[in-house]
Amino acid sequence: MANIRKTHPLLKIINGAVIDLPTPSNISAWWNFGSLLGLCLITQTLTGLFLAMHYTADITLAFSSVAHICRDVNYGWLLRNIHANGASFFFICIYLHIARGLYYGSYLYKETWNIGVLLLLLVMMTAFVGYVLPWGQMSFWGATVITNLLSAFPYIGDTLVQWIWGGFSVDNATLTRFFTFHFLLPFIIMGTTMLHLLFLHETGSNNPTGLDSDADKVTFHPYFSYKDLLGFTILLATLSALALLNPNLLGDPENFTPANPLVTPPHIKPEWYFLFAYAILRSIPNKLGGVLALLFSILILVVVPTLHTSKQRSNTFRPSSQTLFWILVANMLVLTWIGGQPVEHPFIIIGQVASVLYFMLFLFFIPLSGWLENKILDWA
């Protein structure tokens, strides 16, 4: 008699996805981040659900309700600290996951890649509206500055901003709708993640060599299920350490002050995981230009598969493309640093150079490197 997990309508789907799934035998720890992102999503949804039970989406009560959660709710401080720092870990995992895709050429699975870019945009949107909810100074001014950017769009801009605000400034209506979006989006992310996995399992995973691995596949369980479990342990241990020992390390002290429309903070900046995009936005001395640069700093990922010029898929055997990849990583770190600095010399020019280099690497240097490597291979 056949095993129930292979015949039951529901269990056979799970079996095909996480038990008997044929997996390349040589995928490294860089392939752990997909499952870690799933863990982050579950952690964030559960902690967020319990926080939402005690949170009040009203400008007179929001800040107090967060304080109430931390002081009076059983383990409320822990829920809040895990949720706030879990967002940082979510972005660490998502950036490493994308970096893995760029390095090993996983982007050539176009459907999976494009849904991944959509997931990135959804997660960024969720994090942005979530940051507004505690209604501290940086929450309020961050919401004001970022939503105001939409006014740069010709003709419809001002109407669009007022429509999003639900009035003539960031007010109660804005907070209420941001809470609605923050609650709704994770479930949309879950659905999109299912699509991401569906398309991935159509082709199977890529591997570090970038070569076809049909000749050497192993079952996902027990080999990679246990490998993922090790990743889970490391992630949860690190997240727990941060949430328990130094929960405010990555936050902004300004957010411990209740929102005040009459007092502008000296430096308005988003959470650290948005600083690279914020630096690109600020490096262009034109409002619409800055908004478009901000948008394209993420959407440029969509054109990466089209700009793949190399005969080889992965960077494993391509030294010059490897060098450019690590220059891109260093450039991202520089942009992140610049995004947190005041708008003054020499930070302005460093930000502008780094922003130009960011786009040049994607659009020119990396495709050129692939083409040159092909030429060298032809001569060999």
Curated annotation (Swiss-Prot):
Top-level taxon of origin: Eukaryota
Assembly information from the UniProt record: The cytochrome bc1 complex contains 3 respiratory subunits (MT-CYB, CYC1 and UQCRFS1), 2 core proteins (UQCRC1 and UQCRC2) and probably 6 low-molecular weight proteins.
Organism of derivation: Lepisosteus oculatus (Spotted gar)
InterPro entries the UniProt entry points to: Cyt_b/b6_C, Cyt_b/b6_C_sf, Cyt_b/b6_N, Cytb/b6-like_sf, Cytochrome_b, Cytochrome_b_C_euk/bac, Cytochrome_b_N_euk/bac, Di-haem_cyt_TM
Gene Ontology MF annotations: metal ion binding; ubiquinol-cytochrome-c reductase activity
UniProt xrefs under Pfam families: Cytochrom_B_C, Cytochrome_B
GO term, biological process aspect, one: mitochondrial electron transport, ubiquinol to cytochrome c
Keyword rRNA-binding: no
Biological role: Component of the ubiquinol-cytochrome c reductase complex (complex III or cytochrome b-c1 complex) that is part of the mitochondrial respiratory chain. The b-c1 complex mediates electron transfer from ubiquinol to cytochrome c. Contributes to the generation of a proton gradient across the mitochondrial membrane that is then used for ATP synthesis.
Example of a GO cellular component annotation carried by this entry: respiratory chain complex III
Annotated binding of a ubiquinone, by residue: 201
Major localisation: mitochondrion
Membrane topology reported for the UniProt record: Multi-pass membrane protein
Family: Belongs to the cytochrome b family.
Taxonomic lineage of the native organism: Eukaryota, Metazoa, Chordata, Craniata, Vertebrata
The protein's name: Cytochrome b
Cofactor(s) required for function per UniProt: heme b
Note: Heme 1 (or BL or b562) is low-potential and absorbs at about 562 nm, and heme 2 (or BH or b566) is high-potential and absorbs at about 566 nm.
Gene name of the record: mt-cyb
